[in-house]
């Protein structure tokens, strides 16, 4: 699960492996299984979830696109040179903030429905993010 992937990322001494684990945790938390076009969708959803102002949304979006590129270069090309301690720490913090927001949502949903499952909460989160991303694209805060 997402928390396990995040925890495993915290335990890594290899920067690239930690980076990959954090990215996987984000994908597992915010994307449907076997989703195509993960990079853009993940960047959109993380920025919608964490950004407050238009500028913050754009900054988080660009950072996530860069992080995903670094992960791909490391995983597919064997080139992890862009992954530094700073980038790893930044992605760790992004992942932690996303997980915290999702846990808060779980607690809120559980208050009104004690039988709700993580899969159901995840679907609610993803549905809300689809709506939010559409609004942000329409306002120009995210690229269309």
Regions from the PLM with identified roles:
Residues 1-144:
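Amphipathic, oligomerization/interface secondary-structure segments
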């Amino acid at each position: 699960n997402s928390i396990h992937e995040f925890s495993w990322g915290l335990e890594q001494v290899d920067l690239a492996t930690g980076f990959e684990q954090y990215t996987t945790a984000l994908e597992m938390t915010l994307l449907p299984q076997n989703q195509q076009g993960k990079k853009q969708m993940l960047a959109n959803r993380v920025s919608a979830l964490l950004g407050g102002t238009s500028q913050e949304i754009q900054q988080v979006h660009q950072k996530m696109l860069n992080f995903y590129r670094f992960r791909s270069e490391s995983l597919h090309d064997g080139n992890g040179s862009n992954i530094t301690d700073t980038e790893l720490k930044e992605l760790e913090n992004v992942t932690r903030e996303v997980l915290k927001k999702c846990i808060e949502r779980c607690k809120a949903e559980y208050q009104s429905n004690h039988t709700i499952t993580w899969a159901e909460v995840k679907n609610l989160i993803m549905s809300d993010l689809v709506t939010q991303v559409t609004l942000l694209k329409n306002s120009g805060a995210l690229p269309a």
